């Protein structure tokens, strides 16, 4: 009893997951992500790496603002304590974001969306393998039925897309699933800094590849700053049980 009280004061006991709150955040994030293809298709002249750079800049500004509002002067210290797994999560998220742009610009929006629909199944399989989380048999049957339907839709979309684009969409799904597993495993750690580091990785790579061509039209710049859905990916993963 004394130990539990001491741990509570120190902050080691994790609050119970708020499932409803997490589901709302996941719904918001998924809804915004579903419009990403439409937004990118309306970009006039910017190439993939220009879009990556300015999207990462927009995400970085939003996430840094949230971190500063939440922690104030102690926010910089949060960037130092994410550890090795936090760094891996940042790298996976950066990889997934870059792969998403490659997919959406090299195949159809439908083919990309169908492939990304496999994220819940990939994540569940990874959670079972790496975290030992159990999956009920009825859930497995439901997942298999849904996966079969998604596979049919994906096969129908292959004819209008490219092999490269579809492959990048699959890599994007793998990256997001791997990121979700790391976040799930580290629920007691503030993981918003991983989003900041992932954006820094993307910006660094984009600058290397297109440092001499960073000028965009006002229309393209505005569209690059529109999506902010990835800020909703951390809390739901940590809280859904």
Give the positions of each predicted feature:
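Hydrophobic transmembrane alpha-helices of multi-pass small-molecule transport proteins
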Residues: 63, 93, 126, 135-155, ...
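Transmembrane alpha-helices of multi-pass small-molecule transport proteins
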Residues: 46-95, 122-123, 175-179, 196-213
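Helix-loop interface residues and adjacent transmembrane-helix termini in multi-pass membrane transporters
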Residues: 45-46, 106, 132-134, 188-189
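Conserved small/polar residues in nucleotide/adenosyl-binding loops
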Residues: 231-237
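Loop-to-transmembrane alpha-helix entry segments
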Residues: 80, 113-116, 132-152, 159-166, ...
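Glycine-/small-residue-enriched transmembrane alpha-helix faces in small-molecule transporters
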Residues: 2-53, 91, 99, 158-185, ...
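Specific alpha-helical transmembrane segments that line the substrate/conduction pathway
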Residues: 50, 56-61, 101-132
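Residues that define the loop-to-transmembrane-helix transition and helix capping
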Residues: 49, 110, 136, 192-193
């Amino acid at each position: 009893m004394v130990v539990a009280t001491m741990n509570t004061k120190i902050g080691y006991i994790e609050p119970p997951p708020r499932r409803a709150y997490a589901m709302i955040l996941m719904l918001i994030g998924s809804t915004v992500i579903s419009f990403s293809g439409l937004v990118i298709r309306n970009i006039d002249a910017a190439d993939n790496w220009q879009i990556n750079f300015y999207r990462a800049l927009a995400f970085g500004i939003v996430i840094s603002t949230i971190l500063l509002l939440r922690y104030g002067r102690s926010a910089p210290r949060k960037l130092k304590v994410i550890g090795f797994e936090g760094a891996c999560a940042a790298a996976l998220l950066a990889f997934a974001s870059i792969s998403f742009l490659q997919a959406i610009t090299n195949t159809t929006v439908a083919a990309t969306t169908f492939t990304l629909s496999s994220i819940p199944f990939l994540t569940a399989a990874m959670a079972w393998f790496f975290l030992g989380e159990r999956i009920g048999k009825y859930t497995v049957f439901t997942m298999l039925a849904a996966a079969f339907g998604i596979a049919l839709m994906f096969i129908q979309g292959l004819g209008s897309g490219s092999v490269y684009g579809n492959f990048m969409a699959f890599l994007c799904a793998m990256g997001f699933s791997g990121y979700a597993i790391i976040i799930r495993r580290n629920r007691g750690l503030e993981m918003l800094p991983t989003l900041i580091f992932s954006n820094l990785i993307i910006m660094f790579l984009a600058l290397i590849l297109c440092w001499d061509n960073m000028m965009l039209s006002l229309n393209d710049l505005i569209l690059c700053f529109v999506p902010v859905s990835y800020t909703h990916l951390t809390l739901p993963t940590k809280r859904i049980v």
